[in-house]
Amino acid sequence: MAKQRGRKLLQKQNKDDFKHSLDQERHEEEVIQVPVDKAPAPISADGPNTFFGTLDTQELEYFKRAESTMAVDTFESADEKYQFINSVIEESKGKELKLATSQICSKLMERIILAADDQQLKAIFQGINGFFVNLSYNKYASHVVETLLVRSAALIEKELLTPVFEAELDGDEQVYASMENMFLFMLNELKPHMKMMINHQYASHVFRLLILVLSAKKLPKSTQSNSALRSKKSKIARKMVDLKDNADFDRTYRTPDSFKLELKGILVMLYKQFTNGIEPGTKHSEVNIACVTKFREYCVDKVASPVIQLIIQVEGIFDRDRSFWNLVFSNTEQNDPKEESFMEYLLSDSVGSHFLQAVIGFARTKQVERLYKLYMQDRIVKLAKRDTTGAFVIMSLLQNLGSKEVKSILDDLVPELSILLNSNLDFGSEIIEASIRQGDYKKTEIVEQLGKKYYPADSESKNILESCLQLASSTLGNTKDDWPTADERRRALFLEKLINFDDYFLEIAVESLLNLPEERIMQMCYHGVFSHVVEHVLQAKRVETVKRKLLLNILYKDAVNLACNAYGSHIMDKLWEFTAKLTLYKERIANLLLEEADKVKNSIYGRQVWKNWHLELYVRKRFDWRKKVKEQELEVFPDSKPLQPKQKESIPAKRSAPSNNQRPGSLNKKRNAEKHHT
């Protein structure tokens, strides 16, 4: 008989070797296989790659059902949910590492961590103690560790603000150390591997979160893009998991003093590792050039770069010398050839430009001015035309340089503004913001440049909505329920910024809106992005009364449908103020809503419009509603004077004609009667 071979035989052998059951003996065997204190994680160039085994069929089915139950979250009470979580934690004891490294069950671990109470959280933390390094390097387990760290930060703050000296425990409930001590114990486990974590695909995220917790910085949401924790790509992948953060995310936590000391010690340790033992605070010129070159490679590495950015951001908390900044950049006033070539790479590389853009925001103004004057001052326009690289650095310079340098950059960029906007709308927004910060510097020239681009005087078909928003090629009017694109959102925000910047843009936006067909205007009102532009145009104080009436003549006709729409309802709310001192239009809209009151009240959006328009008052106490309208008019137009009665002129009184209810000749009879009486 031929010798058996292949994957099926290997699977059978593995099954025989690692046969699982649900009894206590199996649990003891698992502990013997990978003991915490006897089997340190094997470290390779790619990090530890420990295999913790797999769950058997029964266990896998149980945890799958538990994950589905947690995802649906249809528990009748908080106590029922607590008991369920407790039972899952009990069943997972001894299997935490298998669960965390499983693609399916790691989601269950995260859900349990997010919903666990303080004792349950500590139990989970204790269960994976000693294996944080291994889990941090795993694709799925690293997310579990991140979620655990955020919840731990919240618990550390809670214990810090409300210390409990004698905890009352129920039954066999285990006594745990404080969360601070458990966290510090975990740090000691991770410290020997931190340099390697910096440029690891998964462990780098854990390390970044550690720095944020230790420095008491804001912990961003797990699905927030371009944050200190996640890239845009990572955010999209995270959203696919269908896990929602709890209230512990997206906020800052107070931390004990020991955390600052730990952070300082970690950064000192890393600096010495990168410089072959040199103490922090050493001048750039005294560090071995090979060490500088190696560290600069980390700065432009797509994985390590965000970590280095974060290190440079937090080092100023306790290091006045900014050792890591001075490791990257020289501190001399002369041009350094090697630094110049490094700067050129940063300004032309996508990862490098994002690194330079970020660290410029963290550095001292003096350090930024040095880089600007030595390597960028003479070629601002050239760098600004590098749409995906240098342009972002120039925008960062506009935000962080001194007034003199910013004005110099504006002098160079404003004449080229219309060209720069062809590929980078964000550049236009940043130039406008810089002009405002410098007291409307170059405002006239900016308005002129933007006017030529989006509303040319010599064009008969000029329309800023078409030229700026590109309505013709947009999703406006699509019947496929297409989502608005990111480009449409960017263009809409830019036009709103222009409208805020100068009245000229509001004026031409209103004119352009009125020049569109009514059907097109209403399509904009129901669009997820362009409705915000229409809403932004409706400014009662800045739009002429005649133009306000023309816009209202179009919008009021579909008031009921607008009120019942997610986007149109915001426009209806804006019309309440936009109709100030135009009471006839206000009452006309109120009557239209009143005629279809049932439809409006049955809509979640319509009910809000009904409330904001005070229509209950309009129905029951019309006089009080009109009084509220008058109060609003005084609030919107405080300088306007109420109509005054005409002053009587000092001229001889003329004989008045008889009133309508007075018969002819009655006045003479009255006079004769008075004379007869006399």
Swiss-Prot record:
Family annotation (Gene3D superfamilies): Leucine-rich Repeat Variant
Region Disordered, annotated ranges: 1-31, 636-678
Pfam families: PUF_NOP9
GO biological process: endonucleolytic cleavage in 5'-ETS of tricistronic rRNA transcript (SSU-rRNA, 5.8S rRNA, LSU-rRNA); endonucleolytic cleavage in ITS1 to separate SSU-rRNA from 5.8S rRNA and LSU-rRNA from tricistronic rRNA transcript (SSU-rRNA, 5.8S rRNA, LSU-rRNA); endonucleolytic cleavage to generate mature 5'-end of SSU-rRNA from (SSU-rRNA, 5.8S rRNA, LSU-rRNA); ribosomal small subunit export from nucleus
Alphabetical keyword list: Nucleus, Repeat, Ribosome biogenesis, rRNA processing
A molecular function (GO) term: RNA binding
InterPro entries membership: ARM-like (IPR011989), ARM-type_fold (IPR016024), NOP9 (IPR040000), Pumilio_RNA-bd_rpt (IPR001313)
Protein localization: Nucleus, Nucleolus
Biased composition (Basic residues): 1-10, 668-678
Pumilio repeat segments: 91-126, 127-162, 189-224, 288-326, 338-373, 375-411, 515-552, 553-591
Basic and acidic residues: compositionally biased ranges: 13-30
Assigned GO CC terms: 90S preribosome; nucleolus; preribosome, small subunit precursor; small-subunit processome
Domain of life per record: Eukaryota
Family statement: Belongs to the NOP9 family.
Protein function: RNA-binding nucleolar protein required for pre-rRNA processing. Involved in production of 18S rRNA and assembly of small ribosomal subunit.
Entry protein name: Nucleolar protein 9
